[in-house]
Amino acid sequence: FFPIIAGMAAKVICAITKKC
């Protein structure tokens, strides 16, 4: 369950900061 949340958080951060 945690890996899914971490993945979603990373995706959001990536989209906001444009740093992937």
Curated annotation (Swiss-Prot):
The keyword Chloroplast does not apply. One of its GO terms (biological process) is killing of cells of another organism. Expressed by the skin glands. It holds the Pfam family Antimicrobial_1. One of its GO terms (cellular component) is extracellular region. Its main location: secreted. The keyword Secreted applies. Keywords: Amphibian defense peptide, Antibiotic, Antimicrobial, Cytolysis, Disulfide bond, Fungicide, Hemolysis, Secreted. InterPro entries: Antimicrobial_frog_1. Disulfide bonds join 14-20. It is found in: Secreted. Antimicrobial peptide with activity against Gram-negative and Gram-positive bacteria (MIC=13 uM against E.coli, MIC=3 uM against S.aureus) and fungi (MIC=3 uM against C.albicans). Shows hemolytic activity on human erythrocytes (HC(50)=8 uM). Belongs to the frog skin active peptide (FSAP) family. Brevinin subfamily. This is Brevinin-1SPd. It comes from Lithobates septentrionalis (Mink frog).
